[in-house]
Regions:
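Phosphate-group recognition and catalysis centered on beta-loop-alpha active-site segments
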Residues: 2-309
């Protein structure tokens, strides 16, 4: 019985991958992958963070994704992920594993030059995003963007190089410590110790590592990322908190805001998710930072539907 179920699940999963890769479902077309026009709005109404850059249009954590986000007036923050190479340098990538045809390796096992000199191939396997948007608002656009990114060749860039493409946007720098805290902090210090960090939020879901960073650099703005409601209390040790979208609680958010904390919500990949959180937050829905792969769609929807809260 277990084998049959496993085969069935494999067929379903494989079919979904094929559909996403084809880009033909429900009349999807190339035009729907372009950035939505956002006009006639006050860009101060809602705070938006472009997750890993404009990652629904360009490969995440690349200079093109950052450049696109930097040009969008409605984007307030650009989020990016930093991790260590084997020789202790910081590059921008969410996952340690990288892929190319007939090749797979880990960034942590490669030197900075090896990582940044090689081209890799991007593959998206986020089936949940596909199914969540089959019948949802802006679903065609979201699914089409997802399919158009598959198979694109890209380059991993260093942290300093990536920041050059962010213009005057604020930065959410997600720190992938991976149990290498001391070496990671030293790499951060090499880059930021003599620089103005007033527009940078250092964030991580590793509370121990982030507290160490905050202890030795109290002047750096640090935000804890939480995915479980039992960890919300960690906010008292940091300057801000990033809350996973499915554990948002209006009472907690209001208290955090009243205490001067930055509150961000992650990561929005459908309009239905935006509606659920904005409804839960009520009058505070315009006081938080929305982190999303679809900054154009999310901003436009929020302004049109929740601007009177």
């Amino acid at each position: 019985m277990g084998l049959k179920n496993g085969i069935k699940n494999l067929i379903v999963y494989g079919s979904a991958i094929a559909i996403i890769g084809s880009g033909f479902c429900f009349g999807l077309n190339q035009a729907s992958s372009e950035v939505e026009t956002v006009d006639n709005f006050s860009y101060e109404d809602f705070d938006i963070a472009a997750h890993r850059g404009f990652s629904s249009i360009a490969v995440e954590n690349t200079t093109r994704a950052f450049d696109l986000a930097s040009q969008a007036l409605y984007v307030d923050y650009i989020e990016m992920d930093a991790r260590l190479t084997e020789d202790g340098k910081l590059v921008l990538a969410h996952d340690d594993e990288v892929f190319a045809p007939f090749y797979k390796n880990n960034i942590s096992d490669m030197t900075y030059d090896e990582v940044t000199d090689k081209s890799f191939t991007y593959y998206s396997d986020d089936i949940k995003v596909y199914f969540d948007n089959l019948f949802g608002q802006d679903g065609k656009t979201i699914i089409n963007r997802l399919s158009n990114l598959n198979g694109i060749t890209y380059n991993v860039v260093g942290l300093e190089d990536g920041l050059e493409f962010c213009g005057d946007k604020k930065i959410l720098l997600d720190l992938k410590f991976d149990d290498n805290v001391i070496k990671f902090v030293e790499a951060l210090e090499d880059i930021f110790e003599l620089k103005d960090t007033s527009n940078i939020v250092f964030q991580s879901d590793d509370s121990t590592a982030l507290l160490y960073l905050k202890t030795i650099h109290p002047e750096w703005f640090c935000s804890i990322l939480v995915r479980d409601s039992k960890d919300l209390e960690l906010v008292e040790y940091f300057d801000g908190i990033g809350i996973r979208k499915d554990i948002v609680d209006e009472e907690f958010v209001k208290a955090a805001l009243d205490n001067g904390k930055l509150v961000s919500i992650w990561t929005f990949r459908s309009i239905d998710e935006v509606n659920k959180v904005a409804t839960e937050l009520g009058n505070n829905c315009d006081e938080v930072l929305y982190i999303t792969d679809y900054p154009d769609l999310v901003f436009k929807h929020l302004v049109k539907n929740y601007n009177d809260k």
